[in-house]
């Protein structure tokens, strides 16, 4: 199961890199969001999927799952939500000001010689 999740995380990373390298601001935002999801999936997979039980004390349990990766992932999800919201607002304001979401057309004004 862990090998499958690592491959899925790699595929998500490849898709997100493709989206980040595109010319559209919305695709760049979606690529960064997908990259954070791929990193979260990789971290939760490395935390262990099938070893132990929930870290709540019970009498007859010999091993527990490490709760640190789960806590880090929850924090990363909240931070990713906030940065995605900020990027979406920034992309929307850029579109309203410039009339385009194409990064190539946002290069700036040529200098007067």
From Swiss-Prot:
<comment type="function">
    <text>Mnh complex is a Na(+)Li(+)/H(+) antiporter involved in Na(+) and/or Li(+) excretion. Na(+)/H(+) antiport consumes a transmembrane electrical potential, and is thus inferred to be electrogenic. Does not transport K(+), Ca(2+) or Mg(2+).</text>
</comment>
<keyword id="KW-0813">Transport</keyword>
<dbReference type="Pfam" id="PF00420">
    <property type="entry name" value="Oxidored_q2"/>
</dbReference>
<comment type="similarity">
    <text>Belongs to the CPA3 antiporters (TC 2.A.63) subunit C family.</text>
</comment>
<keyword id="KW-0739">Sodium transport</keyword>
<keyword id="KW-0915">Sodium</keyword>
<dbReference type="InterPro" id="IPR006673">
    <property type="entry name" value="Mnh_C1_su"/>
</dbReference>
<protein>
    <recommendedName>
        <fullName>Na(+)/H(+) antiporter subunit C1</fullName>
    </recommendedName>
</protein>
<dbReference type="GO" id="GO:0005886">
    <property type="term" value="C:plasma membrane"/>
</dbReference>
<dbReference type="GO" id="GO:0008324">
    <property type="term" value="F:monoatomic cation transmembrane transporter activity"/>
</dbReference>
<dbReference type="InterPro" id="IPR039428">
    <property type="entry name" value="NUOK/Mnh_C1-like"/>
</dbReference>
<dbReference type="GO" id="GO:0006814">
    <property type="term" value="P:sodium ion transport"/>
</dbReference>
<keyword id="KW-0375">Hydrogen ion transport</keyword>
<keyword id="KW-0050">Antiport</keyword>
<feature type="transmembrane region" description="Helical">
    <location>
        <begin position="1"/>
        <end position="21"/>
    </location>
</feature>
<feature type="transmembrane region" description="Helical">
    <location>
        <begin position="72"/>
        <end position="92"/>
    </location>
</feature>
<dbReference type="GO" id="GO:0015297">
    <property type="term" value="F:antiporter activity"/>
</dbReference>
<keyword id="KW-0812">Transmembrane</keyword>
<keyword id="KW-0406">Ion transport</keyword>
<comment type="subunit">
    <text>May form a heterooligomeric complex that consists of seven subunits: mnhA1, mnhB1, mnhC1, mnhD1, mnhE1, mnhF1 and mnhG1.</text>
</comment>
<keyword id="KW-1133">Transmembrane helix</keyword>
<keyword id="KW-0472">Membrane</keyword>
<keyword id="KW-1003">Cell membrane</keyword>
<dbReference type="GO" id="GO:1902600">
    <property type="term" value="P:proton transmembrane transport"/>
</dbReference>
<dbReference type="InterPro" id="IPR050601">
    <property type="entry name" value="CPA3_antiporter_subunitC"/>
</dbReference>
<feature type="transmembrane region" description="Helical">
    <location>
        <begin position="28"/>
        <end position="48"/>
    </location>
</feature>
